[in-house]
């Protein structure tokens, strides 16, 4: 085989190899840029996961199966915050443990999105609620209209933190 033919074959192989490698390098770079979003309660996991799709990673702050009403932060859960870009909170009393976790973490200034910001709230009722000093019912995710408002709040705020994907959110 003549040398010029070998060079042409080698160039063709190199171009093919680069064509195969470049997309994987780009996707690795995209994965490195994805937001890591912490959530405190399962409804917010569902909301956020559906908002971001494959554009971000959703990370529960507490392990599955824990009761958020009685949860006490563990060291490994607090440590998880250092790898997050933002945390989505209920913000009206259902996940008060998260404030203590964030304050004790290596990243106490991590941005926080309060899902219930500007969402009409229901007054807490019953002896247990009044005895616990609750003013509003924190189970806002049980209301369809409140859930819709929360999803819109979360999507809007994530769009501000991740403008490249704001249209997706």
Language-model-detected regions and their locations in the chain:
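Bacterial N-terminal signal peptides that target proteins for export
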Residues: 2-14
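Bacterial N-terminal signal peptides
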Residues: 11-24
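Extracytoplasmic metal-acquisition and chelation regions
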Residues: 27-168
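General N-terminal leader/first-domain-start detector
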Residues: 1-2, 25
């Amino acid at each position: 085989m003549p040398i010029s033919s070998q060079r042409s074959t080698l160039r063709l192989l190199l171009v093919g190899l680069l064509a195969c490698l470049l997309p994987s390098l780009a996707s690795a770079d995209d994965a490195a840029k994805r937001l890591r979003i912490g959530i405190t309660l399962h409804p917010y996991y569902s909301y956020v996961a559906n908002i971001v799709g494959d554009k971000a990673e959703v990370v529960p702050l507490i392990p599955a199966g824990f009761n958020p009403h009685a949860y006490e932060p563990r060291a490994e859960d607090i440590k998880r915050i250092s790898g997050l870009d933002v945390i989505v909170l209920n913000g009206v009393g259902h996940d008060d443990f998260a404030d203590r976790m964030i304050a004790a973490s290596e990243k106490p200034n991590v941005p926080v999105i309060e899902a219930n910001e500007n969402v009409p709230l229901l007054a807490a009722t019953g002896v247990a609620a009044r005895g616990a000093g609750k003013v509003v019912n924190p189970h806002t995710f049980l209301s369809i209209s409140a859930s819709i408002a929360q999803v819109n709040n979360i999507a809007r705020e994530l769009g501000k933190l991740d403008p490249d994907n704001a249209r997706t959110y």
